[in-house]
C-alpha cells in the first residue's frame, strides 16, 4: 500500500527506531527527506545519514543519536501540516516554545528552521515541530 504522507512516515520511522533504541533506521529516499536529514544533523538531533542506492530502490540510512544516559536526542517530533490540512506561516513567524523547540518549514529558499526563516524574512509550509 502506498504511503500518502511520506514526511509523516519519515518522522514515525525516526520515532519508532528511537523508542526501540536502534542505532540506525532505513527510510525510502526523496530529495525532501534528504534535506530534512541534513538539517537534523546540523541541529544535532541525529548523528549522521547516508544515501544508499541499491538495485531496487534508493534509501536513506539514518544514524540515531542518544545521550550519555541512553535517552533519544529527539524528545518529541510531531507533524503539523498534513495532506488534508496544510498549515502555512508568514514571514512574521513566532517562536515555538519560546525558542526551546524548532519548527521546520518548507520555504522558497529550501527546508529551514523557524529561526532561519525569520532571519531570511520568508514564510512557508510548517512541516513538523521538534523538541
Swiss-Prot record:
InterPro entries: Ribosomal_uS8, Ribosomal_uS8_CS, Ribosomal_uS8_sf. Belongs to the universal ribosomal protein uS8 family. GO terms for biological process: translation. One of the primary rRNA binding proteins, it binds directly to 16S rRNA central domain where it helps coordinate assembly of the platform of the 30S subunit. The gene is rpsH. Keywords: Ribonucleoprotein, Ribosomal protein, RNA-binding, rRNA-binding. It comes from Prosthecochloris aestuarii (strain DSM 271 / SK 413). GO terms for molecular function: rRNA binding; structural constituent of ribosome. It comes from the Bacteria. Part of the 30S ribosomal subunit. Contacts proteins S5 and S12. One of its GO terms (cellular component) is ribosome. This is Small ribosomal subunit protein uS8.
